[in-house]
């Protein structure tokens, strides 16, 4: 009985703090912490979340990030569906100062012929220093039971130098305004077991400068993004989850990737194609498909096996290359009744074929699911 009371006390906590430990080839070991708070605003069925996290790596890389989703509503509107006029505020803001690696893009000729093995070994990269601040705000307004449409804004300030290749004399500033639409029938925001989620956004972005001939400088770039997920309940308390994600940065002219490199869509990372170096593959377009089978283990613990495939593409010179494949296993621990999980994943990819080298693996310890 005492064990049950202790466990119930744990999963009813309105907030939590956990250590964050990640390992990936681009950063080696990262150590930090994440704190999250969970609450329901008045007359709301869904749980709002606010998160603060940060890490410091053995390569003297650091970042701090704040993000969250707040659910608001006006159930006294008299509408048949009490959530019909609800709206939500999604935000993400942060700053990072980290040595990074410039690997180029597919339009760079020395990366065009990769072959089927050792893609990561061919991409040795050039170290560079990057300071980056960002702010993203979205405010979808409920227009039906499951649909929401609203404005969005995005701002990025970056300063960086790529040794012997490029240096920003002044910070590069990007500001974007657009619209976001989403469809959501998930039974739970943090750990869904059934339902669909679809979000698409389109924005016009202005950049402070680009390195192309005078008179051809575009004033506007197009930023497009799509995120489609499905969650399927299976027998034996299994859940099959899959996601297709695409990001595009398009412009009328052939912009130097040295200028806009930190802004380009990228593949990989702890919430993307796990196991793939998140600095290695960037270009105008990113597309990825991943799936995950989630299964019970014991008490608050669940497991997962996952795999995904994706790549980046040059909008001006589309071509086929060897797809990047990431795969791995993980374990989750549910820490409250909102179904927020502590997640530990181990992943690798076909980018580095070595099985006996730790640099071919990525480790992620964090909160919430990848998707």
Annotated model-derived regions:
Residues 165-166, 212-216, 316-320, 354-357:
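Short, solvent-exposed loop/turn segments at secondary-structure boundaries
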Residues 7-17, 21-173, 267, 280, ...:
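Gram-negative/organellar outer-membrane beta-barrel architecture
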Residues 177-182, 186-298, 303-309, 313:
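C-terminal outer-membrane beta-barrel translocator/porin domains of Gram-negative envelope proteins
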Residues 311-315, 350-352:
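Short, solvent-exposed loop/turn segments at secondary-structure junctions
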Residues 15, 31-33, 62-66, 131-137, ...:
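Hydrophobic, lipid-facing positions within transmembrane beta-strands of outer-membrane proteins
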Residues 321-322, 339:
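C-terminal soluble interaction/assembly domains
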Residues 5-8, 36-43, 69-80, 137-145, ...:
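Outer-membrane beta-barrel proteins
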């Amino acid at each position: 009985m005492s064990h049950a009371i202790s466990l119930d006390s744990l999963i009813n906590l309105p907030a939590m703090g956990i250590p964050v430990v990640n390992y990936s080839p681009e950063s080696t070991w990262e150590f930090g912490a994440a704190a999250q708070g969970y609450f329901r605003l008045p007359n709301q069925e869904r749980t709002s979340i606010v998160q603060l996290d940060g890490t410091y790596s053995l390569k003297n890389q650091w970042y701090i990030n704040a993000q969250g989703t707040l659910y608001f509503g006006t159930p006294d509107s008299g509408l048949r569906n009490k959530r019909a006029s609800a709206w939500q505020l999604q935000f993400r803001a942060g700053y990072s100062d980290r040595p990074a690696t410039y690997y180029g893009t597919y339009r760079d000729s020395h990366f065009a012929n990769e072959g089927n093995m050792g893609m990561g070994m061919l991409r040795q990269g050039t170290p560079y220093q990057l300071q980056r601040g960002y702010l993203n705000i979205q405010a979808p307004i409920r227009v039906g039971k499951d649909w929401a449409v609203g404005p969005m804004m995005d701002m990025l300030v970056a300063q960086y130098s790529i040794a012997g290749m490029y240096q920003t004399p002044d910070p590069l500033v990007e500001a974007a305004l657009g619209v976001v639409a989403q469809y959501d029938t998930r039974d739970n925001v943090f750990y869904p077991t059934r339902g669909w989620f679809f979000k698409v956004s389109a924005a016009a972005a202005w950049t402070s400068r680009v390195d192309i001939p005078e008179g051809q400088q575009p004033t506007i770039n197009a930023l497009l993004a799509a995120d489609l997920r499905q969650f399927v309940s299976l027998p034996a308390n299994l859940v099959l989850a899959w996601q297709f994600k695409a990001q595009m940065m398009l412009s009328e002219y052939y912009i130097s990737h040295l200028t806009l490199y930190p802004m380009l869509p990228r593949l990989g990372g702890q919430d993307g194609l796990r196991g793939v170096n998140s600095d290695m593959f960037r270009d105008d377009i990113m597309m990825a498909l991943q799936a995950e089978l989630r299964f019970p283990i014991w008490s608050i613990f669940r497991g997962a096996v996952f795999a995904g495939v994706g790549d980046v593409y040059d909008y001006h010179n589309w071509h086929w290359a060897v797809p990047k494949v990431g795969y791995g296993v993980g374990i989750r621990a549910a820490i409250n009744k909102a179904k927020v999980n502590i997640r530990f994943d181990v992943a690798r990819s076909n980018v580095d074929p070595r099985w006996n080298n730790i640099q071919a693996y990525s480790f992620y310890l964090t909160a919430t699911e990848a998707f």
